[in-house]
Regions:
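Compositionally biased linear targeting/interaction segments
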Residues: 1-167
Length: 167
């Protein structure tokens, strides 16, 4: 028996968009960091929690060994207080479950975050398809556009018959 599940990745925030690949490294994508911060603020997380999660994701994926302000590199994950001992991946995320490796993730309801956040392997995609969003996706739209959830709900419910060309 083989089971599969299709997920529409045009209506969620791709965690791999937090970094932009360069020839020698992956650099923070300020726009995507802002979108994820907005989203987590809408979900009532504190700035401290948000900064820790974002920094730890970036450190998990980037190529360098320099920890961000609230992040960790190999020295932490291979140290005596971390079991099992492991190294940062230094690659894009393949699965949402990789967040379980990050200490900051313990302060988040990861099942709840899955409604709004996804991992698209091998992709740094940052865009969403506004025309396929449903009412319950208003938080995603509000996070991307920097608007209120009420305004995002209004846009979704008043989507033109032919869809939005741009917003």
């Amino acid at each position: 028996l083989i089971r599969s599940r299709l997920v529409d990745t045009s209506n969620c925030f791709n965690l791999n968009s937090l970094l932009i690949s360069t020839e020698n490294n992956k650099l923070p994508n300020d726009r995507s960091i802002s979108v994820l911060s907005n989203m987590l603020l809408f979900l009532n997380y504190e700035d401290r929690q948000i900064d820790s999660l974002i920094d730890q994701i970036i450190d998990w994926v980037d190529y360098d060994d320099q920890p961000r302000s609230n992040g960790y590199e190999d020295y932490f994950y291979t140290g005596p207080i971390n079991e099992p001992r492991q190294y940062t991946s230094k690659r894009t995320l393949y699965d949402f479950s990789e967040l379980n490796n990050l200490p900051a993730s313990r302060e988040f309801d990861l099942n709840d975050l899955k409604k709004y956040i996804c991992v698209i392997p091998y992709s740094e995609k940052t865009n969403i398809n506004v025309n396929t969003l449903e009412f319950e996706d208003a938080l995603v739209l509000a996070s991307y556009l920097g608007i209120s959830i009420d305004d995002a709900e209004y846009l979704i419910m008043n989507n033109p018959k032919d869809g939005f060309k741009t917003i």
